[in-house]
Amino acid sequence: MKKMIVLLILTCVTLLNGQSFAQEKTLDFWDEAPRLFNTAVAGADIAQPSVQRPNKAFGIDHADKKAGDFSVVYTASGKGRSNVIGFVSSIWGETWALDAQAVLHLHIKIKSSEIPSSWPVELVDSAGRKLSGRVSIGGNGWTEIHLPLKSLKADDSFDYEDIKLCQFRLKLSNDAKLWFDGVHFMSGNRYIGVTDKSLRQRMDEERRTRDSRIALALEASRKDEKTGGPWTSYFASLYLNKDVAEVNAKMLAGLDAHRHEDPWSLFMTPYLCRVYYFFSAKSDKFPGRITPEVEKKLLSVLWDRTYEKNDIHWAKQSTWWLDGSENHDLNAKACNLVSSRIFMNEPEYKDRIYPDYGYGGGLHYGAPSYHGKDLKDRKHGGRATLSDGKEYKAADHYYAWRDFMKEYFIERSKRGFFVERSSRGYMAHTFNFVDLVYTCSGDNDLTQIVKQFYDLAWADWAQEQISGSRGGTKTRHHYNIGNGRMAIYMTYYLGGPGNGSIWFYWSLINGYELPAIVFQTALDRTSLGNYEYISRGVGEEENKWPRPLGTERTLLCDTESRFVKYSYVTPDYILSTQMEHPAAMHSHLSTAGRWQGMVFAQDPECRIVTVGMSYSNDGGARNKKYDMEMMYRSAQSKSVLVTQQARRWYQINPDWFPAQERYQMPMGVYFGNRWDRKEEKEGWIFVETGNAYAAVRPVVWDEVWEKEQSVKNKGNQKYFNSHKQKPTVKLAVDTYTWKRDNTVIELKDKFAPVIIEGGQKRDYATLDAFMADVLDNSLALYKTVVPGYHTLVYTGCGEDAKEIVFNTGSLEIPTIGGAYIDYAYPMAFESPYMKSAYKSGLIEMNTKRLNLNLDFARFEKK
């Protein structure tokens, strides 16, 4: 067994990445903590839980806790009831290195119809020898336990330096629940955490266990081709040095089928590049694991997949011109860079001349199309004539794409990233190609730039999540109100299990480590408190008519996009939207799969998300429960969001993307059905989960009543509101209908504005108190000229709440606190913990004891 390093908690420590910090509070990790716990039947010992199948009787509780962000909770029910409950030293095979002077500390709470006054407790070493005694437990509230190990009876030769688990033997009722928190050992000033660990312990354990976690994930991938087809399995076998001869034979037989198939595949071309750099004769990692025959065939297939698409003239265009979609674009360009590097160092290929047609972007993306009567010889590509007539080899391409990629990542540090930022799946694809540049570019400066970009991207992620559940507004988040894949990567980087399947295998082996400040930010939501996180979005089109030749498959997003991403982040919930200029010119990506709403700490299945109500029965893509293809106008100030399905917006599509029907459809708000409590009153819906509350109000006028009361104008003004009328209208209460097993409401007016407001138990002891405060807020619909088109005015809860004025009938810019929304927000990223002036390329991250500065500007060409 590997033994855990015992930590000193009173000194200043220096990490491997050169950052220094003084020890802060301990941190719990949402993925690890419940995995440490297991149960057993009477007479048996608990076993190390399976990484793939942790014990489902254990979960986390953000509301009832004593330390950190959450406690671990055990729920006894049916088969889940047990007589032995405990926790292991590590899910990766490490053990506790203690001594007889150590003291076990933990908080424990029991809720049961039968509560014994004391429990048998045992610590077990790797040889099965035990340290036994009893521990006293209080009543139904929390009990803090300090258990000196010297007070327990040790079996002969019990090894204090090789302890693998701690368990309690007890009898519980069928309705029992147990909470554990703050579990750790102390001996003098020595500290070793179990559920709650110091930052240094967590980072050290992440490094020490990485090889084990890689091996476990890749072994699962190697044995199960369903996790990504045979090619991912082949990679895993080569990495683990297992069945190498058999894998080589299969690769040799299968490569030709991929020579010309699906040239825009998100998998195959970057896969071939990685196989070359990991396993070819020239590899600096595992040289020679593919045979010379496989290597030769791989190079031939890679050349055929890339030589036409790798057009040097496209490396001279804007890095904000995106071919096809954002992830496809970076896939193609990253592969152009890396394949050029491969071929410039291969004797058989280094002197070959590339076609460099100069036709434009998106070669082979879809059908050839029409190029013009004078360009009948073209079989593919765009209508541009960019070729300069010169001959370029692989080295020329490599240096052109190297410089392009440097600018690409610097630009995204300056203006914001990505169009598909926070997407449920597409951003994960994009990171595949970010990684390809990071690991295989062959240029030290570019590697440093991408390393900084990783740090920035994960800092952005960490600030808008609670226990791995990502808040923040999302684009291209199709058909699903739930979470995304990025948490799978982050779980691994924080020390959790890896995933060796098709879209994740690369993240295991790139050597990337999180900076200490990002590690802390991700795991210390409680200490960060409540804050606003505001950042600039990207994806507004250049509004060029006609579009430049060669961009028939390309987005033109080289703009200072007028998209403001806004999140109000608390330890209990995150409320988010994107506020965008009414005249912003959208791309076909920036309107796709728009997610906004509220996520909650206590239960990731509790969400409040605006959705489209899809009723298609044609079997097509829109035959889904919820449709995210909606466009919104929004205004948010801290815990209050006012949003409405947009009546109008503007969009430019590349030639290939059809100008389909507008997304306008019946609008709904998704709630789910996992709430602790739900109430409806005076047109509002109130919900509670854990320490959070929310209030939702579709705001609609009482049309029938108003028409009965209204004073009519005469003459040609009879269709307008009269100047003699009252300025406001009566609000309707019956504004929505529950649908789909009462999990979602459908608005009776698809253009009705919706108010979403959050609250916390720190401010309101009960949901009733929150309801009373919300119902007392100032809410009105003001008339304009045309009946039915109003201006909503609302001020939320709290003394610092700002008045939001929102015209629901036109594209007028809303005001917050009397000021118009500034869509040219001066900061690219801004929260109390991360700041960057727009287009500066300088990012400053700070917490109370940690800091990190990212300087992209120093890499710019002078």
Question: Language-model features: where?
Answer:
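Positively charged n-region of N-terminal signal peptides that target proteins for export
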Residues: 1-4
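Bacterial N-terminal signal peptides
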Residues: 6-17
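Extracellular carbohydrate-recognition regions
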Residues: 23-56
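Extracellular polysaccharide-targeting segments
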Residues: 25-28, 171-197
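Short carbohydrate-recognition loop motifs
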Residues: 59-85
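Extracellular ligand-binding interfaces
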Residues: 76-157, 173-179
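Ser/Thr/Asn(+Pro)-rich, low-complexity disordered segments
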Residues: 189-331, 335-337, 341-392, 396-405, ...
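Extended amphipathic alpha-helical segments with heptad-repeat/coiled-coil character used for oligomerization
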Residues: 435, 444-512
